[in-house]
Design a protein with these regions (language model features):
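Glycine-rich phosphate-binding loops of nucleotide-dependent enzymes
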Residues: 2-284
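ABC-family P-loop ATPase nucleotide-binding domain
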Residues: 1-26, 268-319, 324-329, 333, ...
């Protein structure tokens, strides 16, 4: 089914348990501080906005929450448990995210992209995949069914077999959200989900986010579209120069003079200059590159491990086959030797007969 919830009729459910609890999160790159002592909580069924001028540290904070960066100070808890400093483990724990720049597998189909998001919820391992037994086929069918449900949910079911690169921009954004939902998260982080969208696409995204909220999923969203944020969010936190300036409901935040000054460009005391801001941006880019390299290394190591396991399985199978063939050949040789022993050689028989005849003549 496609989403039909609207912003004007959507009613937020009562917030449930605390899903995200970030305390004193600080991120430094060398001597530069991009995020400074930020506290933030998000409850299930709640939508929280994170806003601020460019370079305020919003995406850096997201990266600290999702394991792409390891915070210099502070801790991040998900449902009371401290999150491990690896992005794939954070995803497995129950946190999913989208990115500012769309990151889809462009040469894969829409359905295949969503199936990629299911891997953290698939219990079948390497051996099950190699043997392709009943358990593997059952899990594969369940993943496919769930992926199709999610495509229906975001309105892309009719394009399941299309290549991702052929989708319009707005639909690619929806696909990225569907892939994030495929991991069955308890917390969804959206980084500028309406960037580059027209008003109609923005409205559709708003409805989609409300529908996700109604599923009981907590949502933390970064966005520059203030109308979108104020319509959508139960609470809004403002970051300026890496620090949380204020947190509250939409009207309270909009009236705050410090927020107005930040967006109008009025300087704050101790505000970094352009050179320092450029250094922070360069440090973040270097950290992103290092994080991506680590992710690729982890993926390569996992692929090598799978290849080694597959090679061991093939070697074991070959050894079993060779051993069986050797045993069969040995048994055949033994049978042949037995038959030879039981078969009387004609020459030997003749000699034996002659000896017997000679004995009779001598007796005579």
């Amino acid at each position: 089914m496609t989403t039909t919830t609207t912003a004007t009729t959507a009613k937020a459910p009562a917030p449930g348990e605390t899903v995200l609890d970030a305390r004193g999160v600080t991120m430094r790159f060398g001597g530069l501080t991009a995020v400074r002592s930020v506290d933030l909580t998000v409850k299930s069924g709640e939508i929280v906005g994170l806003i601020g001028p460019n370079g305020a540290g919003k995406t850096t904070f997201f990266n600290c929450l999702t394991g792409l960066y390891i915070p210099t100070e502070g801790e991040v808890r998900y449902k009371g448990q401290v999150l491990p400093p690896k992005s794939f483990k954070v995803t497995a724990a129950g946190i999913a995210r989208t990115f500012q720049n769309i990151r889809l597998f462009s040469n894969m189909t829409v359905l295949e992209n969503v199936l990629v998001g299911r891997h953290t919820r698939t219990k079948e391992g390497l051996w099950s995949a190699l043997l392709r037994g009943p358990g593997f086929h059952k899990a594969e069918a369940a993943s496919r069914a769930r992926a199709l449900e999610l495509l229906e949910f975001v309105g892309l079911a009719a394009k399941a077999d299309h290549l991702a690169r052929n989708l319009p921009y707005g639909e690619q954004r929806k696909l990225e959200i569907a892939r994030a939902l495929a991991s069955e998260p308890g917390l969804l982080l959206l980084d500028e989900p309406t960037a580059g969208m027209n008003p109609q696409e923005t409205r559709a995204t708003e409805e989609l986010v409300f529908a996700i909220r109604d599923m009981g999923i907590a949502i933390l969203v970064i966005e520059h579209d203030m109308r979108f944020i104020m319509n959508l969010c139960d609470r809004v936190a403002v970051l300026v120069q890496g620090q949380k300036l204020i947190e509250g409901d939409g009207p309270t935040v909009q009236r705050d003079e410090r927020v107005i000054a930040a967006y109008l460009g009025e300087p704050f005391e101790g505000e970094p200059g352009e050179a320092e801001a450029a250094e922070v941006a360069a440090a973040e880019e270097a950290a992103d590159a290092a994080a991506e390299a680590d992710a690729e290394t982890d993926a390569d190591a996992e692929a090598d491990a799978e290849a080694d396991a597959e090679a061991d399985a093939e070697a074991e199978a070959d050894a079993g086959t060779s051993g069986a063939e050797a045993d069969a050949e040995s048994d055949a040789d033994a049978d042949a030797d037995g038959d030879t022993d039981r078969t009387t050689d004609p020459t030997t028989t003749a000699e034996a007969s002659g000896a017997k005849g000679s004995g009779k003549e001598n007796d005579s």
